[in-house]
Amino acid sequence: MNMTTYNLTHLKQLEAESIHIIREVAAEFDNPVMLYSIGKDSAVMLHLALKAFYPGKPPFPLLHVDTTWKFRDMISFRDHVAEKFGLDLIVHINEEGVKQGVGPFTHGSAKHTDIMKTQSLKQALNKYKFDAAFGGARRDEEKSRAKERVYSFRDEHHRWDPKNQRPELWNIYNGKVNKGESIRVFPLSNWTELDIWQYIYLENIDIVPLYYAAVRPVVERDGTLIMVDDDRMPLKEGEKPMMKSVRFRTLGCYPLTGAIESEANTLPDIIQEMLLATSSERQGRVIDHDSAGSMEQKKREGYF
């Protein structure tokens, strides 16, 4: 009997692993959801989900936790993607936070993130009773994410205890949870930032235009270039936006996301820039610098 063997490239191996994880969760859990933050990792994760269930649609909705401070380009891209693929998109906003006027300028990055992202996410998970939530986090991004399992177990309050996680042997995942508990699932755990960009290029995946370099209005604060995306951003005395060619390596709330000066306006240019980069993509995320161990503390409280 002749048997055909296949030598998969490392990207195809990562793709196969991620699709396996997505299908496992769809089969094991009653009410899964895919967190869609509109960034490059979300774009790849959604692409993998579409592949996993082609020609059908993914058997779970997308959930976007809208802080009301995302870049305008992100919101228009989100709506375009949902319409293009006919996806079930849930947009959740913490209305109590909106009533209180919570924002990054008035309440600071830590409180804004807690109320409009962490608490809002937990509200949505409780409201729709999701028992598994896909996220696009990768282990190479940040040290607390480096020690997180693919199946990351959360208690009834959505809190993460890094000392109380289950072993994962090879590709065997234990999805049993008690009533009220849930898991966060990270199909891209073993991908790197470079893998993401190479896959986007090879698969021709649409991404938010903010990832490409263009001349944009920015101000420099504490060594970080912040894009002036709308008229809600208060300018300091004597501060004037500068027009610079910039792009973003990571996306979030616009007042809390730093741009980098760049001329890379094509995917090959971005990949070339990535190969020469010596800093983390999250260097521009203000929320990661709120305090030492900031990301781990947020995850313990229920953040993704």
From Swiss-Prot:
Protein name, entry field: Sulfate adenylyltransferase subunit 2 2
Top-rank lineage group of the source organism: Bacteria
Keywords of this entry: ATP-binding, Nucleotide-binding, Nucleotidyltransferase, Transferase
Pathway: Sulfur metabolism; hydrogen sulfide biosynthesis; sulfite from sulfate: step 1/3
Disulfide bonds: none
PANTHER family: SULFATE ADENYLYLTRANSFERASE SUBUNIT 2 (PTHR43196:SF1)
Gene Ontology MF: a single term: sulfate adenylyltransferase (ATP) activity
Gene: cysD2
Record-linked NCBIfam families: CysD, PRK05253.1, PRK12563.1
Record GO biological process: hydrogen sulfide biosynthetic process; sulfate assimilation
Role according to the record: With CysN forms the ATP sulfurylase (ATPS) that catalyzes the adenylation of sulfate producing adenosine 5'-phosphosulfate (APS) and diphosphate, the first enzymatic step in sulfur assimilation pathway. APS synthesis involves the formation of a high-energy phosphoric-sulfuric acid anhydride bond driven by GTP hydrolysis by CysN coupled to ATP hydrolysis by CysD.
The keyword ATP-binding is assigned to this record: yes
Cross-referenced Gene3D superfamilies: HUPs
InterPro entries in alphabetical order: PAPS_reduct_dom, Rossmann-like_a/b/a_fold, SO4_adenylTrfase_ssu, Sulfate_adenylyltrnsfr_sub2
E.C. designation(s): 2.7.7.4
Top EC class of this enzyme: transferase
Catalytic activity annotation: sulfate + ATP + H(+) = adenosine 5'-phosphosulfate + diphosphate
Similarity annotation: Belongs to the PAPS reductase family. CysD subfamily.
Native source organism of the sequence: Marinobacter nauticus (strain ATCC 700491 / DSM 11845 / VT8)
Binding partners and assembly: Heterodimer composed of CysD, the smaller subunit, and CysN.
